[in-house]
């Protein structure tokens, strides 16, 4: 787990925490591009992640709501956590993984290098595989973060690696626009792991 801090300039001074949790390992072939595909996660690893999270979340008893991506692999973990914490569960499409278009369901190694090169050369604007651009991902995550500030309360988000990286990028750069693929966060949150985000609203 790693803590990040971001302070937006607003009229208030209330600090809130967001738990950004990645789903457990999905039941897919290694190296598969699965983005928006609705695949399940390993149930035993999901339960293990839930146990690990409960130990950490016991320190944040004030959390009243959990938001989850609507994909099966995230809802498996979200449902367990919501039941164990006895808090509200809300499905949020904006928390879904990036849409990789026609390349979803293909192995990354089988995707033409020319397609990946075009994406990295126009990283903010190019819709990879005809799906979603990195800029579109960043803008919807920016909206989520703005909505979170307005709630003025700690939250749990059960989501995906791409969304977590988008949050990290926005926190480091202060805007939902990326100039180069080289600026994209390299650190990956492991399956079933999490980071926390402290925001001053």
Segment roles from a protein language model:
Residues 161-165, 195:
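GST superfamily/GST-like fold recognition
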Residues 80, 84, 147, 170-174:
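Active-site catalytic microenvironments for nucleophilic, acid-base chemistry
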Residues 18-76, 130-141:
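Loop-to-helix element that buttresses phosphate recognition and phosphoryl-transfer chemistry
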